């Protein structure tokens, strides 16, 4: 990784302005990629504004990852073949998908190289579009211009055209049709109340800005705010601190050390954020260290999953290391411990060790503790037997290396812990080199020391381990990191243990370890929960020394709030019934313009055609005319359709032989007496049009509505076992759901990153190619995302969370 000075110098050399350079170097992933891409160009290449922008664009796509054949794209840019950001995007996707097999010809074909669209051609398509939508434009006038731009931009015939030519042409042609703007195009003035709110809001903002002190976060208050500064943790050998500070430069250094023996769960997200976030807040560094000391339970899939989840949460390790990297040094220190008279080889059985530690036959502590018969063997004998363990002369269980601590201590962590055991298992990284493996209690503190960790942050279950942690470092004369403990995060109403989740998977109660009803991080991601929502949630909880037990509903509430601010809206019908408007012709079309997120113009808007046939929710119609609490469609009560000019009124029903409603006939109440206003309905409902012209509706293969997996808050307490507590309605699958055709735009633009989202405190840049980033609010139904099993011909949706309030009126 290049230094900031090197990055700044190179970016300035190719012509980026100082302000832009400062902006670029703030993003390490993008700046590192940009540096490498520039280095792939000839040293005498004459950069211009366009090529700088396009290569910067490419760097933002690469963002720190390895991209084989990236030189194909760079050469395409500097040779003038790739002229637009759209072409660069297409070229990037092609090279990313094909890797080393990528060719210049293949890239050019996939990115529109050589396709020239003239300004006259653009104008012809714009004029054609305006003619086709003339009535709507005449009605809605200039406020429709942004929508025209969006629609023209999406015309397949103009895919490779320069979008910079669109706006001036659209402006010219709209002006020809409508003439200059007049009073019809003026934006209505805000009311006095709105102005007052604005003033109060500005005052409040000003007051907040004026308040002294840094912004409050989980990293500068509570447990984390009270942590020691680098260099303040005491040492048995003060000279070691001097060496430590020289290595670290006085900066914070933390680590996240998972065991690669399973998938991470929601509790680990807090550990990830605490360790990576604390280091980042203090401009320090954080390791991702795999504690791979038990080869019998480790598997490559766990290593990869852990890396994915750390990256998904928005963190990049300073270095990825493995405890196995240090096996040679750990072995050397074990011999040092023996030579110092502080370790011995023990041949006791597991039961004998328990009795020596005062564990009674019924498993309870409190019995008399006594020394093992091997404890006072000579140093020479212990050293020889330990080497025999290393050389495979003992079978598993026949010999262990134990630390000689203090059996009179009240802490179980000082009762001669095991340091090494014999395991005849090949290691994923070291193969068959070792027949003995260090334990967590021996490895953890020493590797922390080797990596010069300044703050060894772990959960309170390891509180007693602090004494043995410090004891071992001191006995082998190494730097002693400071272990500090915070409360773990638990979610009630579910299970997090690997054994129980494995049982759920093996017995087919769930689809797999990433089933959206589980709380593994893989499952939460598949369900569609944004990583930013998790970080925001953890920040809200803060960090203390108390264990945090959170109900699922509270977690979902936090996710819902995050989604509310960051997702577009679409009309979607879960359980559809067809509606036919009898007083409208088959070719009737009324275009409704609907914002993707009301109140946030930057999300844009879309057009939905109202025709003489559409779908509504089956539950939005009731034959009961006496229910005064039901505000939707009934035989004697009209209902409004979202963004449609008039209400619809019931006319008749069609039912099948079983009595199920298959079609509702209505009238469109568009005949209003002159001088009168349309009658306002009691409520509005969502609808999805039936229109072959617009390829509507989009039919959903499966809509999976997820509820809590278990019926109680503590499944493990069920007298017949946790499996008996499973909620039979935890997954409800709908096979006939429909939604508006604009879902295609949502997929194309996902993740939906507008400025208000990108500038939020916990925004995390996500992989555009992952299906779960395609999130949206199904109006009046819930929040949904694409499931990983979806294909171009098969749409499968997962419900992330429900809306706040169930629709009851």
From Swiss-Prot:
It catalyses: tRNA(Gln) + L-glutamine + ATP = L-glutaminyl-tRNA(Gln) + AMP + diphosphate. Residues 185-198 have a biased composition (Basic and acidic residues). SUPFAM superfamilies: Nucleotidylyl transferase, Ribosomal protein L25-like. A motif ('KMSKS' region) lies at residues 495-499. Keywords: Aminoacyl-tRNA synthetase, ATP-binding, Ligase, Nucleotide-binding, Phosphoprotein, Protein biosynthesis. The keyword Signal does not apply. GO terms for molecular function: ATP binding; glutamine-tRNA ligase activity; mRNA binding; sequence-specific mRNA binding. Its EC number is 6.1.1.18. GO terms for biological process: glutaminyl-tRNA aminoacylation. ATP binds at residues 259-261, 265-271, 459, 488-489, 496-498. PANTHER family: GLUTAMINE--TRNA LIGASE, GLUTAMINE-TRNA LIGASE. NCBIfam families: glnS. Present with 37500 molecules/cell in log phase SD medium. This is Glutamine--tRNA ligase. It comes from Saccharomyces cerevisiae (strain ATCC 204508 / S288c) (Baker's yeast).
